[in-house]
Amino acid sequence: MEAFHTHTGIGVPLRRSNVDTDQIIPAVYLKRVTRTGFEDGLFASWRSDPSFVLNLSPFDRGSVLVAGPDFGTGSSREHAVWALMDYGFRVVISSRFGDIFRGNAGKAGLLAAEVSQDGVELLWKLIEQSPGLEITANLQDRNITAGTTVLPFKIDDHTAWRLLEGLDDIALTLRKLDRIESYEATYPDWKPRTSPVA
């Protein structure tokens, strides 16, 4: 996973609340056996509407999604995060996230930045007044900058550390490879064991 420090991109106002993972990517798109190629399913039922925000320029090139409260609720499909990232999003800003979505985002390298609902409303207003407005998310300082507006965001310390270091679950495990191999070397032969990493 690539480390996340700062990201600047066009802000996309998604003025919808309670967006669940089935709305982010419907179940019909979950049949792939890889982690890529899910961008076509992102908001599929809404993208058939020509007036949907992702069908409008410059928002179709956005990488910072500003969503309503309770974004990513519902089932625990990692595909929702993968679809957002495959489309090009690197940051999602909301006043509340589904717990599982927030966890999946951090594990995949997508920043889920929690700001106040007043902050979300202000960002929507700024973006709609200046389509193409670039928004910067600074993870180290934990703030969002849009023009002259600076808003703090919340993220738990462990997820922030993982993102800053670029550590997914596999990378976290591999940091302890010496200890794992040492344990395996002393493990009795008659018990099941794992194969060494090639």
Swiss-Prot record:
It catalyses: (2R,3S)-3-isopropylmalate = (2S)-2-isopropylmalate. Pathway: Amino-acid biosynthesis; L-leucine biosynthesis; L-leucine from 3-methyl-2-oxobutanoate: step 2/4. Coiled coil: none annotated. One of its GO terms (cellular component) is 3-isopropylmalate dehydratase complex. Transmembrane segments: none annotated. Keywords: Amino-acid biosynthesis, Branched-chain amino acid biosynthesis, Leucine biosynthesis, Lyase. It is an enzyme of class 4 (lyase). GO terms for biological process: L-leucine biosynthetic process. It holds the Pfam family Aconitase_C. GO terms for molecular function: 3-isopropylmalate dehydratase activity. InterPro entries: 3-IsopropMal_deHydase_ssu, Aconitase/3IPM_dehydase_swvl, AconitaseA/IPMdHydase_ssu_swvl, IPMI_Swivel, LeuD. Its EC number is 4.2.1.33. PANTHER family: 3-ISOPROPYLMALATE DEHYDRATASE SMALL SUBUNIT, 3-ISOPROPYLMALATE DEHYDRATASE SMALL SUBUNIT 2-RELATED-RELATED. HAMAP family: LeuD_type1 (MF_01031). Belongs to the LeuD family. LeuD type 1 subfamily. Heterodimer of LeuC and LeuD. Catalyzes the isomerization between 2-isopropylmalate and 3-isopropylmalate, via the formation of 2-isopropylmaleate. This is 3-isopropylmalate dehydratase small subunit.
